[in-house]
Design a protein with these regions (language model features):
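The feature captures the beta-strand-to-loop junction immediately N-terminal to the Walker
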Residues: 45-47
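Conserved coupling/switch loops of ABC nucleotide-binding domains, chiefly the family-specific signature
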Residues: 66-69, 119, 219, 251
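Conserved ABC transporter NBD signature motif
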Residues: 68-76
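Non-catalytic connector elements of ABC transporters
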Residues: 247, 258-374
């Protein structure tokens, strides 16, 4: 793709096949596989120690995998040294040279590749235009804000027109408001350039906002690879459901009801109609289902008050907590069985709000819950 600023980038497919890595006998990445098509953005999402940064470093060539392959444009680059992979990298702390100006920092990878002066000047100007830093050429990193430093690092990573861009916690050093602004800005630039991108973050909102695909990792294992919508609405495991967004997690057993409908019964006796999910695997000839011991219900799907009266699943409950969080109201309620749930609604300017100790009805539809494996 030819960007408005003049750089010509052709995003290439990126594939990891069975990547594994251990340090001192401890396995930190275990058989991780994924494919990113040209021009797409994949986020490796997970907590600290999940293996996401090690996976990124193997793609960059900074770590050698113990097993597996890395392919760019279907070409195996596993044995190729980092400086010959033609991959752009944005580091968490930006790694700008403090003694070089903005223009000199951006020009550095071009100088290492022995580009001519005129070409360097043209490409540096184009890259700085793309990240909206025209007029900052002669400033030094210490004279820039955190967001501006991040833009310089991004310009440096794309100035040599790599087909693949890697970003390690690129927004982690920014404050919340600036981070939210830069999420949109980085995504805009990535789409404008059409550059294939893999980004690492522990921030679930960042992953949901920026990604075409999310790879959720924990303990070196890839739990789910799917679109942001699929990961949020259809989490494949309990870990994914807990890590992304807020969830009500109920423990119990799942049995067959009428037709394809299922009944989940909590350990405390609450019976819930559900449509099943990733953990609903029927045993041949049995009335019970194997593997599904947890039910997930997002708080925004739990209705409260009159709105719950017509729900297929509806229960008498008592409000234990009522929290006002600006645009939202959050309620912790307990059903007559003792099962506790969170409900989340938009905060009305006027109208019904519930208080601690009030008796209410809560409810949701079968399709609003999901069974997952532990």
């Amino acid at each position: 793709m030819v960007a408005d600023g003049g750089l010509k980038i052709h995003g290439a497919s990126l594939e990891a096949r069975g990547l594994s890595k251990a340090f001192g006998g401890a396995r930190v990445v275990s058989d991780v596989s994924f494919r990113v098509e040209g021009g797409a953005l994949l986020t490796l999402l997970g907590p600290s120690g999940s293996g996401k940064t090690t996976t990124l470093r193997m793609i960059a060539g900074f770590e050698d995998p113990d097993a597996g392959q890395i392919l760019v444009a279907d070409e195996d680059i596993t044995e190729r040294p980092a400086h010959r992979r033609n991959i752009g990298v944005v580091f968490q702390q930006y790694a700008l040279f403090p003694h070089l100006t903005v223009a000199q920092n951006v020009a550095y990878p071009l100088e290492m590749r022995r580009y001519g002066r005129a070409e360097i000047r043209s490409r540096v100007g184009a890259a700085l235009d793309l990240v909206r830093l025209q007029g900052y050429e002669t400033r030094y990193p210490r004279q820039l804000s955190g967001g501006q430093q991040q833009r310089v690092a991004l310009a440096r990573a794309i100035v040599f027109e790599p087909p693949v861009l890697l970003m390690d916690e690129p927004l982690g050093a920014l404050d919340k408001r600036l981070r939210e602004t830069m999420q949109i800005e980085v995504r805009r630039l990535q789409q404008q350039l059409g550059i294939t991108t893999v980004s690492v973050t522990h921030d679930q909102v960042e992953a949901l906002v920026m990604s075409d695909l999310i790879a959720v990792m924990d303990g070196g294992v890839l739990h789910q690879l799917a679109s942001p919508l699929e990961v949020y609405q259809r989490p494949a495991t309990q870990f994914v459901a807990d890590f992304i967004g807020e969830s009500n997690l109920l423990v119990g057993t799942l049995s067959e009801a009428v037709g394809s409908a299922l009944t989940f019964t909590t350990a405390k006796g609450l019976r819930i109609q559900t449509q099943g999910g990733a953990g609903a695997t029927r045993l041949p000839g049995a009335t019970h289902l194997a593997g599904a011991t947890h039910l997930i219900i997002r708080p925004e799907h739990v209705r409260i008050g009159p709105d719950a009266e017509r729900a297929a699943n509806r229960y008498a409950a008592e409000v234990l907590e009522a929290l006002y969080v600006g645009d939202l109201l959050k309620y912790r309620v307990v059903a007559e069985t003792g099962d506790e749930l969170w409900a989340k609604t938009l905060a009305p300017a006027t109208g019904q709000r519930w208080s601690k100790g009030q008796r209410v009805t809560v409810g949701w539809e079968p399709g609003d819950s999901l069974t997952v494996s532990a």
